[in-house]
Structure formats: C-alpha cells, structure tokens
Amino acid sequence: MNSKLVLIVAGEASGDLHGASLVGAMVKREPGIRFYGIGGVNLKTAGVDLWADAADMAVVGLTEVASKLRGILTVMHRLKKSMQLLKPDLVILIDYPDFNLPLARSAKKNGIPVFYYISPQVWAWRKGRLRTISGLVDRMAVILPFEEPLYRQAGVDVSFVGHPLLDVVQATSSRDETLRMFGLREDVTTVALLPGSRKGEVTRLLPVMLKAARILTENICPVQFLLPMANTLDETWMKDQIAKADPPGVRLIRGATYDAVAAADAAVVVSGTATLETALLGTPLIVIYKVSALSYLIGRMLISVDHIGLVNIVAGKTVAPELIQGAANPERIAAEILAILGQPDRRKAIQEELSHLRDKLGLPGAAERAAVMALTLIKKSDC
C-alpha cells in the first residue's frame, strides 16, 4: 500500500482515546500511513496532525452548543474543503454525530470512503439517523453488542468489534501504593469524584460534587477524596474551581486516573464513558447527570432508554444509582454514597454485578479488528 492519507475526527475525550488506539493499530500494519483531523492529546501523541482540539469541540446541551457554534462551523468548513484539496483516501469518524454526519455527506460527494468507528447512540434517541448512516457510511465498527443487529437491520455494513476499554482500563498499582503515591492515607475511606471531560459539564457538576464532599466529611471521619482530571481540561482552571468551593481533603490528580478510581471505595461519576471505566475497575459508583432545563426538557421527549448511565444500559438494569437533573444535588449524592459505604453487603453486591459487565463487552482487541476493517476499505477504494 502506497503512502495513504486519512482524515480522522474525534470530537470528545473518549473518542480521542479510542481513536489513538485505532491509529496505532493501523500504523503498525501500514507504517507509511498519515493522519490529520480533530482530536486531543492522545491522537496528537499517536502522530495525527491536529487541525482542531477536541476540547474546543466537545459540548453538552443546547446552551453550550450555541456558545461554540461559530468555531465548530469554521472547523467543519476547513475539513470539508480539505477533502476537495487533499483528497484523503479514507475518512474515519468517531461518534460525535452532529458534526460527523455532515462530514460523511461531504466525503460521499467527493467519492471518499467513510469508516465509522463507535456508533452514535441511535438506540437511545434519534433513530431516524439509521437511514442517514446507511446512505453515508461504507463500513461501521460498533463497540456494544446490541448495536450490531440494529444497524444490520437498517442495511449498514456493520461488525461488533468488542469494547476498546477492555484493552486500556486497568490499574497499574495496588490501592495502598496508589494512595501513598498521592500522599494520602491507606487506612482512610476514599471517594473518587469524576465530573467529566468537558469544561461545561465540569462547571455545572463539580461544585455540586464538592458540596457533597463537604457533607460526607461531616458524616464520615476521616474521609479523603480523589479528583482525577481529564487531559482535555486546564489544570490551573481546575484548581480555581476547587478553590472556590474550598472543600476539605480533595486531591486533584493528573494522570493515573485508573489507579485513582480503582483505589477508591466508591465514586461519584458523571454520565458517560467514565461510568463504564469505573465499572470495569470494580469501584461501586453512583451516576449523575445534569444539563440546562431546556436541554433536559427536549431530551425527555426524545430519549427512549430506561437508563442514562452506560454502565446500567449495558447491564440492562440498575446496577449504579442514577441521580438526574434536580436529584443530582449535594444532599442526594452524599446520601447515596453513604448508603454504599455504610452497607457492606450492598457494596459487595454492586461489585459482583460490575464483575459481570466485562463478559458483555466482547473480547479485547477492538482497535486491531477495527484497523483491519479500515485498511481493507482503503484497499477496496484502490481497485
């Protein structure tokens, strides 16, 4: 295969992580292949020429979309133009459908094959997108087992490749080693706080979590908190957010997120991929979700699933308590964490349920299987 050029777009932190694994697997098979597009620190480290940072593209809710719309449209225009000028051999799209589907349409017009890795959550809302995807995407790799039959029924050339988190989610140190590394006590109850990877959701949810931490401090003596931060966020900004609340015993962690979560006795986690990561590490958790009132109202009318947390969606039942919108308040969060920590039998039952999730997510090696699919698509387009 001659030197090929691939446009890859990952607009969120999880897509950046999984995209980097995919790029690595493709380069391992075809060392001369080149990539450009949108991503974060992981895709940059993997060698992708970034035209925009995923941190500037990630949004939650209508109000955040409005504030970033101009910049997002500018980036989209540049990428569409690049298809005409650079003529990439393949477009790889990772989730992020409101941005990626218009790009897929442009790729189709320019005769460029489209590989979609990690499905938009059409099973939760906007199922009409299935028809759109069927007409625009040449090949799709999905990471949840129930997605494959859904897309196949819609006429999409789809394969379930397993969940990429199975290859990356693991602690590298024991609980005691991790706590010592962070300068914390090993004999103290530890709670992890995961407020998300997008600045907007962190602004909205971190103050609530920190108030809950203060309530927990009043009820558990002693207790300490680990706050792993996403690499999409600025450390100085995060420290400022924490300082405003002035909570006791909160340690901000950069890097070693999986070690930090695995070392915790319980975790408060914003809805999203982080709930599945926490579950795979075996840490009992509660899921919180909060957006603007308008976004929530519209979402209630459109969303057709019983759960908001990915951990519960995959399990098919409530494994982790969910606190949504008004229920995601400091008092309720603290009460749910106290219930987990104060009832050893309940905590053990949750951990047992979490241990079964891994079996539902397929086998390790998702990126390698997806890489073969993507490279095959490039070779087909050469014929």
Swiss-Prot record:
Any one GO cellular component localisation term in the record: membrane
Alphabetically ordered keywords of this record: Glycosyltransferase, Lipid A biosynthesis, Lipid biosynthesis, Lipid metabolism, Transferase
GO biological process: lipid A biosynthetic process
Biological pathway: Bacterial outer membrane biogenesis; LPS lipid A biosynthesis
Catalytic activity: a lipid X + a UDP-2-N,3-O-bis[(3R)-3-hydroxyacyl]-alpha-D-glucosamine = a lipid A disaccharide + UDP + H(+)
EC code: 2.4.1.182
Main enzyme class: transferase
GO molecular function: lipid-A-disaccharide synthase activity; phospholipid binding
Record-stated family: Belongs to the LpxB family.
Purpose: Condensation of UDP-2,3-diacylglucosamine and 2,3-diacylglucosamine-1-phosphate to form lipid A disaccharide, a precursor of lipid A, a phosphorylated glycolipid that anchors the lipopolysaccharide to the outer membrane of the cell.
Protein name, per record: Lipid-A-disaccharide synthase
Species of provenance: Syntrophus aciditrophicus (strain SB)
